[in-house]
Amino acid sequence: MKTQMTRDNLATARTLSEALPYLQRFNDAVVVVKFGGNAMGDDAEMASFARDMVLLRQVGVNPVVVHGGGPMINDMLAKLGIESTFLNGKRVTDAATVDVVEMVLSGRVNKRIVQAINAQGGKAVGLSGKDANLITCVPADPELGFVGDPSQVDPSVINTLFEDDIIPVIAPLGQGAEGETYNINGDTAAGAIASALQADRLLLLTNVSGVKNAAGDVVTELTAADVDAMVADGTIAGGMIPKTETALQAVRTGVRACIIVDGRVPNAVLLELFTEHGAGSMIRA
């Protein structure tokens, strides 16, 4: 017979108690999460992410998952003998390539995330930006082919899913004025959807610890002006630039805050939303 609580049990109870103000703050909040990278190929990390999404829904948060799929796309193109060409770090997407992109994103990656969430007791539905006219695109750059930038987002289908406690899982595809399919950068798609929903939070999960200052330390809170200055002086560079561009666009168009989150940290989404110190770099307007 057990006669006393273990330290672990006490720590768990204390953590739950400390989370209460954050649970209250985010009740009925909309949180858009960009999920991608190596975690999508790891069963344990996928299951952990799925549990976090189900928990969010159970405590009254409305999560929206937008995913990438670059590594899987590269693998499939290689199997089919289609050579990938990149221009300034962006994939040139011709007609043959966009068909493969759609097949992988909508048919493989999207459904894997949906299944993972459902397996954890949640209810998820997979969509792409082509469904219900969710994302309308214009060409990002004629030289990139079928790579699009969102020109209009109609979030009504997402709001309908919220009413039935369903977690939307969205592949970053859109359609043009003539019905053509466009591949969209996952961060860009997530930002556009967050803006259309006027989301409380946009979380960009990545494989770095956050935005770093000149000394190499993670900056936990920044304003849009801070980000502009750090880009101008070269402190923010390389792959962090497009992520901060997405963040700035989002917070300047109605999203309350965007957080660049270290997705390698277990339960990073929960840590960011429900603890005092979070798990990344928060950017506000």
From Swiss-Prot:
Ranges in a coiled coil: none
Binding residue positions for substrate: 69-70, 91, 183
Annotated S-S bridges: none
Keywords, in A-Z order: Amino-acid biosynthesis, Arginine biosynthesis, ATP-binding, Cytoplasm, Kinase, Nucleotide-binding, Transferase
BP term (GO), one: L-arginine biosynthetic process
Enzyme Commission designation: 2.7.2.8
Subcellular location: Cytoplasm
InterPro entries found in the cross-reference section: AceGlu_kinase-like_sf (IPR036393), AcgluKinase_fam (IPR004662), ArgB (IPR037528), Asp/Glu/Uridylate_kinase (IPR001048), Glu/AcGlu_kinase (IPR001057), NAGK-C (IPR041727)
Pathway(s) per entry: Amino-acid biosynthesis; L-arginine biosynthesis; N(2)-acetyl-L-ornithine from L-glutamate: step 2/4
Keyword Thylakoid belongs to the record: no
Catalysis: reaction(s): N-acetyl-L-glutamate + ATP = N-acetyl-L-glutamyl 5-phosphate + ADP
Gene Ontology CC terms, in alphabetical order: cytoplasm
Residues the UniProt record annotates as site (Transition state stabilizer): 34, 243
One Gene Ontology molecular-function label: ATP binding
Transferase found in the keyword field: yes
Record-linked Pfam families: AA_kinase
Function field: Catalyzes the ATP-dependent phosphorylation of N-acetyl-L-glutamate.
Family (UniProt): Belongs to the acetylglutamate kinase family. ArgB subfamily.
Entry protein name: Acetylglutamate kinase
Species annotation: Jannaschia sp. (strain CCS1)
Gene: argB
